[in-house]
Amino acid sequence: MNTNSEDEIFSILKPVETCLAEDDKARLWARIRQDSLRMRAFRRAAVIAVSAAAAIVAGVAIYFTGTWRSAEPQYIQYISEAMPEAGGDIRIETSDKVIEVSSDATVSYHDGYFSVRDSVETKIHDIKKGGDVHQMIVPFGKTACLNLSDGTKMQLNSGTRVIYKAEMNGRSREIYLNGEAFLDVFHDETSPFCVKTDRLDVSVLGTKFNVKAYPSDKQQSIVLVSGKVSVTGNLLEHAYQMKPEQRFCYDGSNCNASLETVDVEDYTCWTEGILRFNGANIKDVLMQLSRYYNARFSCDSTITDISITGKLDLRNGIDAALESISLVSGIKYRNRHSLYEISK
């Protein structure tokens, strides 16, 4: 942070603050702090963009080149980009191949190789080199499981991208995430595990937690099931230490961070094909259905004030899910050329 510029702002304002009421002072300082945080975000984004552009000009591939540490700006830039809305196959990208799986997949890493299992068969692939960096992309409409070489297990929701080392060894374990995942991190006190999004860093030793970080969403959140988690980030004023049954939320629209006690099942039951809502706006509900089923919706303006409370089973298909919503909310829906039109 450029402390000189902030000191200048403070020195300009202090002589006049004596003329302000206490409430006005509080609002003014809050606005200054918010602007300062936004400036940090702008600087970080500028550094990332310049680093990525420099790599392209130099003829260097953004993705599979350089050391893990030196490539961090490129990885952050990569995961900050929204996933394409179109569906497709689940993809595992390595330094020398692209593996596509049409149905929900489980990818497991071992010493020197990794396996890819779908509903039909299991295939074995060699890991070319210990430092190889892989990427797994789960398109909208599909989910997948990823078991890392250190023993950490991940369930990946629709529209999720993960960048990780094929062989996790050394004193630190890191992954880069765009989308949503539930993690059961293998406990290792000598090697912290860190999940990096484009805004936050989540550090643990061994725990179970959910991370939601879709680039198209204003908010990013972490829900802790067990263990301990530390959340940091360039946009945060300080580190947040989480306890089980807490949810941390960062709102990028106003740079606000919050920590609250929640029912963790509301945020993790998607791993079982269930969604639970407590007064959720129907547009937020439809957004989650859009990602899960890779479906398109057109909403009439008359539904914007509808809220949904209850449990929704996703395993019976999109029409069954919409029928359940219709029963509790009174909405009408119809499918016209793969576009669901929603109205009262």
Model-predicted segments: where are they?
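Membrane-interface anchoring determinants
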Residues: 1-85
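A residue-level detector for the "anchor" residue at the start of short, highly conserved motifs
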Residues: 32, 44-48, 60-344
